């Protein structure tokens, strides 16, 4: 056991975590040269296309150190994006140490700071590594200084390497086996294992990735899942090298998978404890705090026949991504679907793409909204995550919106643009610190301003240099109103929005203009209106397509022409009374792209 090292790699997006992981696998001979490819661990198509890590991946490697001993390295590659911090905290719970990878050109960014604090809070040994040293703009002294100033860990002897060229990677491994402590635990004690991740395989059932704290588990053992109390027979255990490799057993301190033909999707929840059925009194390990979704949106199948398949797909995805929550909902415009909770906009896009690709579904998404707290005049407090469920304005005494504390790290030359953007998004500055060439600003901002397009706008105003980390702080009273969209006088529940009263008229005009472009012309005029309560604040009209009924009249009396035009007008009027307007999918997403 003294030769096992469990560690995670934490870093900001694009600082080279997955490439460093590739080098480790190559140097320790985890895969042959033929099987090696760039970003081996990012196995999902989506991860490769977007160049980001979404799921944490674990690998077990054997490294022969210079002191002649062979060490077993269990390492977990973690995502760097702010929406997937939950994956990171889960991975860290299985480790004794973490490599903090920082790009030697760009320096410390907000996400590395946040993940690093999580690691330090969980009592891990953090080892700084400077990556991308082969780039001409690498400035190791400045970056070491930033690590010490911003994060507060000693970086004087941080290892310099370049994951791309392979320079200094062996030095990283050497330092790692000596810096990161060995796991603690008794091999002879009763089994106690923590489920870090699980996914559903159509042939094998639920596959669980576990970190064994105490004892051992082997094929043929009967294991007990503590939360459900059910007993399962272990079919096989093993590790990823990154290939599935079966082993005789998993012992205390190791990370590997257990397959026990669990067919029920909720049979082995993430964060649960496994033990042997012969020792049911083993205490439950502290799991992970359940994470609360920040953004809610409705997902509806285009064809109502797909509803059951959609439900199954969501169940399987929730097993693999436990931060996703969902409940059934119905909409007048879109039929039956689910209201889903996500950690952020990127998370929502990824889930929607995974549902469409992996489960072959066609989905319509409504505009996302955050959770609001309402105090009614009766004194009761309710929470609302869907604008169409808002009670009448006259019944509400106080409207409270969620406020987040956003920490932004930005080079000094882009500070002005970032401050302007934060003020536009109704932010209130908390403090500002100058750290070398970077500035750290903290703002309190309404969550609905942050989750929609703030990240993209921040990147574009700072030319990609600013980085962001945010967390929920509190609820605060605000002057909010519900903006309804009416098409030909009928409210469309799926298009309702909650906006600040000051922006309502502008948003209303922008939304009706956008809808006018997206709704195809019909045989009759289509009136698109935006309303707050009973007051219409904006209107546009999609003009009718009309046939030239006068084409056949050459000359002749004017009363003949009038008669034909009146007849056409009467026909259009009749059509309008019975006609339905088809709203295309783009119109539901138009709400997202309103430039505030």
Curated annotation (Swiss-Prot):
Compartments where located: Cell inner membrane
Q: For the tr-type G domain, which residue ranges apply? A: 2-184
Family annotation (InterPro entries): EF-4 (IPR006297), EFG_III/V (IPR035647), EFG_V-like (IPR000640), EFTu-like_2 (IPR004161), LepA_C_sf (IPR038363), LepA_CTD (IPR013842), LepA_IV (IPR035654), P-loop_NTPase (IPR027417)
- What's an example of a GO molecular-function annotation for this chain? guanosine tetraphosphate binding
Q: How does it sit in the membrane?
A: Peripheral membrane protein
One GO BP:
positive regulation of translation
The record's Gene Ontology cellular component field reads: plasma membrane
What reactions does this protein catalyze? GTP + H2O = GDP + phosphate + H(+)
For this protein, what is the EC number?
A: 3.6.5.n1
Q: What class of enzyme is it?
A: hydrolase
Q: Does the keyword Transmembrane apply?
A: no
Task: Give yes or no: UniProt keyword Cell inner membrane.
Answer: yes
Which residues hold GTP?
A: 14-19, 131-134
Q: What is its main location?
A: membrane
* Superkingdom classification of source: Bacteria
Q: Which residues form a coiled coil?
A: none
Keyword entries, A-Z: Cell inner membrane, Cell membrane, GTP-binding, Hydrolase, Membrane, Nucleotide-binding, Protein biosynthesis
The UniProt similarity line reads: Belongs to the TRAFAC class translation factor GTPase superfamily. Classic translation factor GTPase family. LepA subfamily.
**Function of this protein?**
Required for accurate and efficient protein synthesis under certain stress conditions. May act as a fidelity factor of the translation reaction, by catalyzing a one-codon backward translocation of tRNAs on improperly translocated ribosomes. Back-translocation proceeds from a post-translocation (POST) complex to a pre-translocation (PRE) complex, thus giving elongation factor G a second chance to translocate the tRNAs correctly. Binds to ribosomes in a GTP-dependent manner.
List the PANTHER family: TRANSLATION FACTOR GUF1 HOMOLOG, CHLOROPLASTIC (PTHR43512:SF4), TRANSLATION FACTOR GUF1-RELATED (PTHR43512)
Q: Which HAMAP family match?
A: LepA
Name of the protein this chain belongs to: Elongation factor 4
In its UniProt entry, the species of origin is given as Pseudomonas putida (strain ATCC 700007 / DSM 6899 / JCM 31910 / BCRC 17059 / LMG 24140 / F1)
What lineage is on file?
Bacteria, Pseudomonadati, Pseudomonadota, Gammaproteobacteria, Pseudomonadales
Q: Which gene encodes it?
A: lepA
């Amino acid at each position: 056991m003294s030769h096992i090292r469990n560690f995670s790699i934490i870093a900001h997006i694009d600082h080279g975590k997955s490439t460093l992981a590739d080098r480790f696998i190559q140097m320790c001979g985890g895969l042959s040269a033929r099987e090696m490819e760039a970003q081996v661990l990012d196995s999902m198509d989506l991860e490769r296309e977007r160049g980001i890590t979404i799921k944490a991946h674990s690998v077990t490697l054997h490294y022969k150190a210079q002191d002649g001993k062979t060490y077993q390295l269990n390492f977990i590659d973690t995502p760097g994006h702010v929406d997937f911090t939950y994956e990171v905290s889960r991975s860290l719970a299985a480790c004794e140490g973490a490599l903090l990878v920082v790009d030697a050109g760009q320096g410390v960014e907000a996400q590395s700071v946040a993940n690093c604090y999580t690691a330090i809070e969980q009592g891990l040994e953090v080892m700084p590594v400077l990556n991308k040293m082969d780039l001409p703009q690498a400035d190791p002294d400045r970056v070491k200084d930033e690590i010490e100033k911003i994060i507060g860990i000693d970086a004087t002897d941080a290892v310099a390497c370049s994951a791309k060229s392979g320079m200094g990677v062996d030095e990283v491994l050497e330092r790692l086996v000596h810096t990161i402590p060995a796991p603690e635990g008794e091999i002879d004690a009763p089994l106690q294992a923590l489920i870090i991740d699980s996914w559903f395989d159509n042939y094998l059932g639920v596959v669980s990735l576990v970190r064994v704290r105490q004892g051992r588990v082997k094929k043929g053992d009967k294991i007990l899942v503590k939360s459900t109390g059910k007993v399962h027979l272990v079919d096989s255990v093993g590790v990823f090298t990154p290939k599935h490799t079966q082993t005789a057993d998993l012992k205390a301190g190791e990370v590997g998978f257990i397959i026990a033909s669990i067919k029920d999707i909720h049979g082995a929840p993430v964060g649960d404890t496994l033990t042997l059925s012969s020792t049911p009194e083993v205490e439950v390990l502290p799991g992970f705090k359940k994470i609360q979704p920040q953004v809610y949106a409705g997902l509806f199948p285009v064809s109502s026949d797909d509803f059951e398949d959609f439900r199954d797909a969501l169940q399987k995805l929730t097993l693999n991504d436990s931060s996703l929550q969902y409940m059934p909902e119905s909409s007048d415009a879109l039929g039956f679907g689910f209201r889903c909770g996500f950690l952020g906009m990127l998370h929502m896009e990824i889930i929607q793409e995974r549902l469409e690709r992996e489960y072959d579904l066609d989905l319509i998404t409504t505009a996302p909204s955050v959770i609001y707290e309402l105090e009614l005049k009766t004194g009761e407090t309710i929470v609302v995550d869907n604008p169409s469920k808002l009670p009448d304005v006259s019944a509400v005494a106080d409207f409270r919106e969620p406020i987040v504390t956003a920490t932004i790290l930005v080079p000094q030359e882009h500070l002005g643009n970032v401050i302007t953007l934060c003020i536009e998004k109704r932010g209130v500055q908390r403090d500002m610190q100058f750290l070398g060439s970077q500035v750290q600003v903290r703002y309190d901002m309404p969550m609905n301003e942050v989750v929609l397009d703030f990240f993209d706008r921040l990147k574009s105003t700072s030319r990609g240099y600013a980085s962001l980390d945010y967390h929920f702080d509190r609820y605060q009273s605000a002057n909010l109103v519900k903006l309804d969209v009416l098409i030909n006088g009928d409210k469309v529940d799926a298009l309702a929005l909650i906006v600040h009263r000051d922006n309502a008229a502008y948003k209303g005009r922008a939304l009706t203009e956008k809808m006018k472009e997206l709704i195809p012309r019909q045989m009759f005029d289509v009136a698109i209106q935006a309303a707050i309560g009973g007051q219409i604040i904006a209107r546009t009209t999609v003009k009718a397509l009309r046939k030239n009924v006068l084409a056949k009249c050459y000359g002749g009396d004017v009363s003949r022409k009038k008669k034909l035009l009146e007849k056409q007008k009467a026909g259009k009027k009749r059509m309008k009374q019975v006609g339905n307007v088809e709203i295309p999918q783009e119109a539901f997403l138009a709400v997202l792209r309103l430039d505030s």
